[in-house]
Regions:
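Short loop->beta-strand "edge-of-pocket" segments that line small-molecule binding or catalytic clefts
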Residues: 28-32, 50, 129-143, 158
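Extracytoplasmic small-molecule ligand-binding "clamshell" domains
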Residues: 22-93, 102, 234
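Flexible hinge/capping segments at coil-to-helix
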Residues: 22, 119-137
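A ligand-binding cleft/hinge motif common to bilobed small-molecule-binding domains
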Residues: 77-80, 93-102, 149, 173, ...
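Periplasmic-binding protein-like
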Residues: 34, 112-119, 184, 188-229, ...
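Beta->alpha turn/N-cap motifs
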Residues: 32-36, 71-76, 85-97, 121, ...
Length: 248
C-alpha cells in the first residue's frame, strides 16, 4: 500500500455532487510562478510547464469542457497581471487568506499545505524554539504566507524577504539567514535538489488551504468548484497526490 509523505497534504473538504458545468470549450490562460516544484515548474526534458497544479487544472478542465494554457509569471506581479486581464486565473500554490479574498475570488481548497523550514544540512538539528529564542534569521519569498509565518516566528527585524525563492535559497547558502520558510508540499523536491547541502529540517508548521484564483466576480469559479468536486469524488485527486508525494 502506498503511504503519503507526511507534509500535511490532505483533501480539502468532502467531495460534492458531480459536475454539470460546461464552459463550452473555452481556452483559459493560467498564470503560474513556475519555480515551485512539484506544484509548478519547467520540465527540463520538454521545456513545458508541469506539476501538480497543472495536472489539477487540466483534470478539472476535462470535466467542465475547457482547456488551459499556462503562462510563466513572476510571483511579485502575478495578482496584478490577473487583475489586468493578462490571464484568466492563477494556479500557483496560492494560500487562501481573508485579505486576498477581499480582492480576488478563490475556488474551494484543493489541498492543504503545511509550511516548513529549509536549513543548511549542518543545522538540521535546529528546532523551532532555536529560531524563536536564539536570534536566528529567516527568509521567505516576499508577499507570501511564508513571509508572514517567518515574521511570526522570529520577528520582522530577523526576516529577509526576497522577490524570488532562489534569492532566499542563496541567502541561506551564503549564511545571511539560518532558514527559509517554504511550502511543505515542495519539501521532498528541495530535499532531492539540494541533497547534502540543504534539508527540510522543520516540518508541519502552519497549515494553509490552497485555492485556484480568479478575478472578483468571475462566474467561472462556480464551474471550477463543480469540476473540483468531481475529481475529488472519482479518485482523480487521490491519483494526483499519489503521483507527486506518495512513496512505496
Amino acid at each position: 500500500m502506498m503511504k503519503k509523505i507526511s507534509i500535511a497534504l490532505a483533501f480539502a473538504l468532502a467531495a460534492g455532487p458531480l459536475s454539470a458545468a460546461d464552459l463550452g470549450g473555452a481556452a483559459l490562460k493560467v498564470g503560474s510562478d513556475t519555480t515551485s516544484p512539484p506544484m509548478e515548474f519547467i520540465d527540463t526534458a520538454t521545456g513545458q510547464i508541469a506539476g501538480f497544479d497543472v495536472d489539477v487544472v487540466n483534470a478539472i478542465c476535462a470535466k467542465i469542457n475547457c482547456t488551459a494554457e499556462f503562462v510563466t509569471t513572476g510571483w511579485d506581479g502575478i495578482f496584478a497581471a490577473l487583475d489586468q486581464g493578462s490571464f484568466d486565473m492563477v494556479a500557483s500554490g496560492v494560500s487562501i487568506t481573508e485579505e486576498r479574498q477581499k480582492v480576488m475570488d478563490f475556488t474551494e481548497p484543493y489541498i492543504i499545505n503545511g509550511q516548513a523550514i529549509l536549513v543548511r544540512a549542518a543545522d538540521q538539528g535546529l528546532t523551532l524554539d532555536d529560531f524563536r529564542t536564539n536570534g536566528k534569521k529567516l527568509s521567505a519569498q516576499a508577499n507570501t504566507t511564508d513571509a508572514e509565518l517567518a515574521t511570526s516566528i522570529v520577528g520582522d527585524g530577523n526576516v529577509l524577504a526576497y522577490d524570488t525563492f532562489n534569492a532566499s535559497v542563496l541567502a541561506l547558502k551564503n549564511g545571511d539567514v539560518d532558514g527559509v520558510v517554504i511550502n511543505g508540499a515542495n519539501g521532498p523536491a528541495y530535499d532531492k535538489e539540494f541533497a547534502g547541502e540543504l534539508v527540510v529540517g522543520i516540518k508541519d508548521l502552519q497549515s494553509d488551504p490552497l485555492g485556484l484564483v480568479f478575478r472578483k466576480g468571475d462566474p467561472n469559479v462556480a464551474a471550477f468548484n463543480e469540476g473540483l468536486a468531481e475529481i475529488k469524488a472519482d479518485g482523480t485527486m487521490d491519483a494526483l497526490i499519489a503521483k507527486y508525494w506518495a512513496v512505496q
